[in-house]
Design a protein with these regions (language model features):
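C-type cytochrome heme c attachment motif
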Residues: 63-70, 126-129
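Glycan-processing catalytic domains of CAZymes
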Residues: 73, 94-98, 181
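Short active-site neighborhood of thiol/selenol oxidoreductases, capturing the structured segment around
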Residues: 51-66, 91
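Non-globular targeting/processing and membrane-anchoring segments
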Residues: 11, 19-40, 46-49, 121, ...
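Thioredoxin-like thiol-disulfide oxidoreductase module
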Residues: 79-164
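N-terminal cap/lid subdomain of alpha/beta-hydrolase-fold enzymes
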Residues: 71-77
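Positively charged n-region of N-terminal signal peptides that target proteins for export
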Residues: 1-4
Length: 181
C-alpha cells in the first residue's frame, strides 16, 4: 500500500513540475517578435514604409527589469502575438542603460540611453512606444500589459487608427463589452 502511495505521489509531483516549467514556453521573442536592426531608426522607417507596415514599435527595456522579463516570457513569446505584430509593425528593443550608438528618427546619432531618457522620457521599464511612418510617437504604454489579449488590443488600437479618436482605456472597455455579447 505504501509503495502505491509513493508511486502516485512521485507521478503527481512529476506532472506538477512539468506543468510549472512549461507555463511560459513559446517562441524566442528575440528571434520571432523583434526584428534585427543595425540601430538606424531613420532607415527602419523607410523599411517599414517599403513593407507597408503601420509603423514601428520600440520596446524600451533594461536587463534586470522583472516586468520586461514577464512580457518576454509570457506575451512576446506567443505565436499569435508574434504573427500580429510582425504583420503590422517593425519591432525593436532599446536598452535604456545602453551605450550603443544608434541613429534616431531624425538621423541624429545618439546612445541608446540618451535616446530613451532624453528623447523619449523613459524613466521606468518596460515602455512600449509606437511610432508612425514619419517617426512621430503616436502611442506610449508604460509597464507590462495584463496579458496576451491586452497586448494584441494595443497593437490593434494603433494599427486601425483608434488612437486618433479614443483613449486606450476606453478602447479596451469597448473590446471587453464586445466579447461579452
Amino acid at each position: 500500500m505504501l509503495r502505491h502511495y509513493v508511486i502516485a505521489l512521485t507521478l503527481s509531483l512529476g506532472l506538477l513540475t512539468s506543468t510549472v516549467t512549461t507555463a511560459g514556453v513559446g517562441n524566442d521573442p528575440y528571434k520571432y517578435f523583434f526584428n534585427e536592426t543595425w540601430g538606424d531608426f531613420r532607415e527602419e522607417l523607410a523599411n517599414a514604409k517599403q513593407q507597408n507596415k503601420k509603423g514601428i514599435l520600440i520596446f524600451f527595456e533594461m536587463d534586470e527589469c522583472p516586468f520586461c522579463h514577464y512580457m518576454k516570457s509570457n506575451v512576446l513569446n506567443q505565436p499569435e502575438v508574434q504573427a500580429f505584430y510582425r504583420e503590422n509593425f517593425l519591432n525593436f528593443t532599446v536598452d535604456i542603460e545602453g551605450d550603443v550608438e544608434i541613429t534616431n528618427m531624425e538621423g541624429k546619432v545618439t546612445k541608446q540611453k540618451d535616446f530613451a531618457f532624453l528623447e523619449n522620457r523613459v524613466r521606468a521599464t518596460p515602455v512600449i512606444a509606437f511610432f508612425d511612418l514619419d517617426g512621430n510617437r503616436i502611442f506610449r504604454h508604460t509597464g507590462k500589459t495584463s496579458g496576451i489579449e491586452e497586448f494584441i488590443w494595443m497593437g490593434q488600437y494603433v494599427a486601425d487608427g483608434s488612437y486618433k479618436e479614443t483613449s486606450f482605456t476606453r478602447y479596451k472597455r469597448n473590446k471587453r463589452e464586445e466579447k461579452k455579447k
